Design a protein with these regions (language model features):
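Condensing-enzyme catalytic core of the thiolase-fold
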Residues: 1-173
Length: 173
């Protein structure tokens, strides 16, 4: 149920990163990926959609305004951690799949955290496309992260970035 300023969209549309975004939309689904060492997958003749080069994990617990609210500091730290572990220069990343829920609070915090983390490595701007599968299928709760991983793997394999729907004007917050 929509309540202004809270989590759910007023019109049933998830408008990730859009000025008119006012909440997320729930979705239903499950996601499964097979994770295997690259050498083993090559040896076994498996089709490789993507490689996971590094991960980051943290908890920004007390540094945020509420249970569902993200923090810029916590997200920026975990993004930096993942980039460092993967040994990836952010300037080489052409597409980023964001959590992007379409909420007034979450999307601007996520963009600011990404900007802060990337600025540690480069002064370049607008070199990396960004999207969120949630505009297409809604928020799948515990399957949301894997849905995003699957989208990225398919994007890499096909060399085409699917559009983020319901996006017209950038959220200036």
């Amino acid at each position: 149920v929509h309540e202004p300023g809270l989590n759910y969209s007023s019109d049933g549309r998830c408008k990730v990163f859009d000025a008119s975004a006012d909440g997320m939309v729930g979705g239903e689904g499950a996601a499964v990926i097979m994770v295997k060492r690259a050498n083993d997958a090559i040896r076994d003749g498996d089709h490789i959609y993507a490689l996971l080069r590094g991960i980051g994990l943290n908890n920004d617990g007390a540094e945020k305004s509420g249970f569902y609210a993200p923090s810029v500091k916590g997200q920026s730290e975990v993004i930096s951690q993942a980039l460092q572990e993967a040994k990836v220069d952010p300037q080489t990343i052409a597409y980023l799949e964001a959590h992007g829920t379409g909420t007034n609070l979450g999307d601007p915090v996520e963009i600011l955290a990404l900007s802060d983390a990337y600025r540690l490595h480069t002064d370049k701007t607008q070199f990396c496309a960004i999207g969120s599968v949630k505009s297409n299928i809604g928020h799948l709760d515990s399957a949301a992260g894997l849905a995003g991983c699957i989208k990225v793997a398919l994007t890499l394999g096909r060399g085409e970035i699917p559009p983020t729907i319901n996006y017209c004007e950038p959220n200036s917050a």
